Amino acid sequence: MQSEAHRENVPAEILRRSIGNDRVHSSYLFTGTGQLPATTAQVFARALVCRNADRGEVCESCDACHRSYEDPEGTPIVLDGKGKRGPTHRHIGDHPDLLWVERGDGDTRITIGQIRDIQIALRLGANEGGRRVAVISGAEWMNPQAQNALLRLLEEPPSDTSLILVASRASAIIATIRSRSVRIRFEDESAVGLRDSETPAEVAEIVQVLDDLRGQSVGQLLDFAEQYRGARATAAEGVTELIDVCAEWLRMEVKDRVGRGETPTTRSLDAHRSLQQLRRDLVQRNANPQMVAERLLLGLRDAVA
């Protein structure tokens, strides 16, 4: 697997190397949190159909650039994973060869139907004689069936097509897809301090519970986890944030222990592995968000006891 490190001008670097050297790949995997990976994917996709991108940059003057432009203040078309209340994918701007896929409104997954629709669209070839590009944003929300369907496309990619996957973590994508993709890593844009003036209120509330884990009863932790019941799409987003905060809190806890000359306990290391497994259960196995939150909090309580 080829790899690139994130730098501030990463879109230009990627395109200079890929387009300038005529080595555009069939699959890319952008990983990192925050908006930058998805924004970069959109810029990259637009540049791949730009008529004047020999320097690896979108010219913004050719017809392709005009058609692929999206007003930042505009409202994107709402998708539906089942294709009943809306389309399964949309175009970037109104360019027919730039496709964008993400979870549908209220959906908990990127569905296998959405991936199959993208397969069909990519195999049809470009409408305007250049490349056809598909971006899958939030690719970590594909379940194993959708990922396996995508793998079949990558095993025999149509000519002059590129697929750009955007995921918060590479580990959420199966190894056989990762091995066929050029990896682009981004720094964590959304990371915030757990205890500073810019910490969001919902994060501060979680940290307060974690800081007092040793004093929390099982009942209190179960009561806290009850907030993650309800509509699964919303609850899953909340538990994803809970997992992120817990992972950072645990990392700092272990770091503090090492700084005091203590050896991290086996239970702390096991808790870190459990965090990753719970993340996979939530995303790939459709686990109940409230139950994931309960297992997470009770497991951390045991780890620091």
Mark where each language-model region is.
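Residues that scaffold the ATP/ADP-binding catalytic core of kinase and kinase-like folds
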Residues: 145, 153, 176
